[in-house]
Amino acid sequence: MSEPASISAGIAQRYATAIFAIAQDNNDLKGLETGINDLTAALGESADLRSLIASPLVSRAEQEAAITAVAKKMKLNPVLANALSLMAQKRRLFVLPQLLTALRDALAEARGEVTAEVASAKALTKTQIEKLTKTLSEKVGKSVTINATVDESLIGGLVVKVGSKMIDSSIRSKLNSLQNAMKEVG
């Protein structure tokens, strides 16, 4: 991870921890989740909003006024709305996408859920996803949601990432290992 990305992730994580703790104290995790989903959708749909949070040309006051208006219009959770206003004052709105990801992860962890990133050479069938979900749930002891992607360069097998753990049973990695072993011998 590059240094600026890790700095952004660190900033986002600190805000996420505070927002989550306050929402939890207020027993409003559902409202927080709704706000996260709404903001994620708005960021995906609105180039103007993405420009607002990323542009250094927009002043603090303009950013704060705009994000406050957006929060009011979207009827966001008060904790989230106040945090966005504070982030605008501190010129930290550029970390909003990472903040939303960190908050989503915190909510999933509070519910005892974890997301597994699964890459396969071809699309997994519904039965394969169900079996993999069951197996991973037993291994990690939590409810697992699978985020499946197709990567034809794997040739065959799977690459599974759950949290900081990765299991690579792809043909590509086995061929790379074999190639490295042959280089050592020859």
Swiss-Prot record:
Main location class: membrane
Localisation: Cell inner membrane
Membrane-related topology note: Peripheral membrane protein
Function: F(1)F(0) ATP synthase produces ATP from ADP in the presence of a proton or sodium gradient. F-type ATPases consist of two structural domains, F(1) containing the extramembraneous catalytic core and F(0) containing the membrane proton channel, linked together by a central stalk and a peripheral stalk. During catalysis, ATP synthesis in the catalytic domain of F(1) is coupled via a rotary mechanism of the central stalk subunits to proton translocation. This protein is part of the stalk that links CF(0) to CF(1). It either transmits conformational changes from CF(0) to CF(1) or is implicated in proton conduction.
Gene: atpH
Keyword RNA-binding: no
Species this protein is from: Ruegeria pomeroyi (strain ATCC 700808 / DSM 15171 / DSS-3)
Name of this protein: ATP synthase subunit delta
Database matches in Pfam families: OSCP
